[in-house]
Amino acid sequence: MSEGKVDEFMAITGADDAAIATQFIEMADGNLNTAISLFFENGGAALLSSNNTPTPSNSTPMAPTSVDSDADAQLAERLQREAYQQQQPDQDYVRPPDEARHEVLTETSGFPISYGGIGGRFEPLHRVNDMFDEGRPESIFNQRLDDTNTNTYINDNSSDSLDSEEENDDDEYEYVEEPVIELDEDGNIKEYTKLVRKPKTISKEQKLALLFRPPFSIMSKLDLDAAKQKARAKQKWIMINIQDSGIFQCQALNRDLWSSRPVKTIIKENFVFLQYQYESRNAQPYLQFYHLNNKDDLPHIAILDPITGERVKQWNRVVPIPEQFISEINEFLASFSLDPKVPNPTVNEPLPKVDPTTLTEEQQMELAIKESLNNNSSKSNQEEVPSTGEEQKRVQEPDPFSTIEARVHPEPPNKPGITTRIQIRTGDGSRLVRRFNALEDTVRTIYEVIKTEMDGFADSRFTLNDHQREDLIDKLNMTIADAGLKNSSLLLEKLDPEIE
């Protein structure tokens, strides 16, 4: 143990016993700050005051201090005993109140460190990885920043230039020394090596990772509130992209749109760009405030006013073509301004759907009654208008069955591919099997044959259904082939006169 630590300990604490200083430093494993904290937390201040005051005559003399190799517990016990001995002469002794202290809480996002006291260490309140979905393992489709940056505070240091784009080139290319042989002006052979830029030999997995890499070079590593402050300071809009790594369209957005250099350029010049995963911590305030409650709306891109927080433009469920996206951005920048003196166009956003689970019981009842009344009124309006037209049609159009006449149709000879056999069964078990010309005979022909060849149906009303229980009265003018009745079995049912 260095004597410098002992001297520094005694100078800070005011202790005049080097043995005590040595003991506390050993207890703290050589950590001077921890040793000083232990000294004051375990009665060191009382020990100093007792050494500076005269000892009463009737008190027990203080035992000489000795250093014991394993005296941690003994030291604490001795300090406690000595404190009690100082209080014995005056039974009415009252400990003075703790000294008042005034301290200032430091803004945790201002410096990239963690903090903590003895026996504990606390992580920062906001981390860069709060942008990502930590509930899913890191993979090609769920990429994050390098491990060296994941536990730091949210502190955006991104520049407004695209110089950082070279990092992508570094991932794809490398410089290799190659020998070069040349002839100088005198005809002598000159041999040397030079660095040659060549594509790296990378695996298929690495190629996919580069292909679907998020746009880290333009992403601001901030939460939404900090991004608004930065955007106001730099007179820029906020562009936010909400993704879900399980939706391929979100991956296609990284691959096709955010990888475009012209898109990155226009974003860097005019926007503070944020990209959050749907389940991430940073995305939750946006999802709740702007009512993005359905993953079916992903990928979601929006432009926010950093002053008012208004969402002035958005894209949902699409992967814009880079050229079209740039055109829309230019139109937006031409129409909207961050100058408070310049009026902006009115934005009519669709009303968000109310989530019933977030309402109270009374609000849920009111919502249900309101929707029920709206549905009933809309249905009644829809039914009232066409009902008059339908009644007029029924008056004007004759009954299809009344147009069917009893006509004799001779059975055609068998012609493969042209004729077909159809079985007509009744409810009492009787049946009629007959050939028809599938290409020329219509469904009406079947009805006319029934009226002429089956007993009891000439003057009766009946229904004729196919094997799917579909009434064929609506297919009277269709050919047998078009109606799908080749080699079919039809069910014939006579209706009661009362039903007619």
From Swiss-Prot:
Q: What is its main location?
A: nucleus
Q: SMART domains of this UniProt entry?
A: UAS, UBX
Bias (Low complexity) ranges? 50-61, 148-161
* Pfam (any one): UBA_4
- What's one GO-annotated cellular component? nucleus
Annotated UBX domain ranges read 415-493
Q: Which InterPro entries match?
A: Thioredoxin-like_sf, UAS, UBA-like_sf, Ubiquitin-like_domsf, UBX_dom, UBX_domain-protein
The region called Disordered is annotated at: 50-70, 142-169, 371-399
| Compartment(s) where it occurs, according to its Swiss-Prot or TrEMBL record | Nucleus; Cytoplasm
Keyword list, A-Z: Cytoplasm, Nucleus, Phosphoprotein, Ubl conjugation pathway
Q: Name one GO biological process term.
A: proteasome-mediated ubiquitin-dependent protein catabolic process
Q: Does the keyword Chaperone apply?
A: no
Q: Which domain of life is it from?
A: Eukaryota
Taking the record's annotation, the residue ranges forming a coiled coil are: none
Q: Name one GO molecular function term.
A: ubiquitin binding
Question: In this chain, where does the modification Phosphoserine occur?
Answer: 139
Chain's role = Involved in CDC48-dependent protein degradation through the ubiquitin/proteasome pathway.
The subunit field of the Swiss-Prot or TrEMBL record says: Interacts with CDC48.
Misc remark: Present with 6630 molecules/cell in log phase SD medium.
In its UniProt entry, what is this protein called? UBX domain-containing protein 5
Native source species = Saccharomyces cerevisiae (strain ATCC 204508 / S288c)
Q: What is the lineage of its organism?
A: Eukaryota, Fungi, Dikarya, Ascomycota, Saccharomycotina
What gene does this protein come from?
A: UBX5
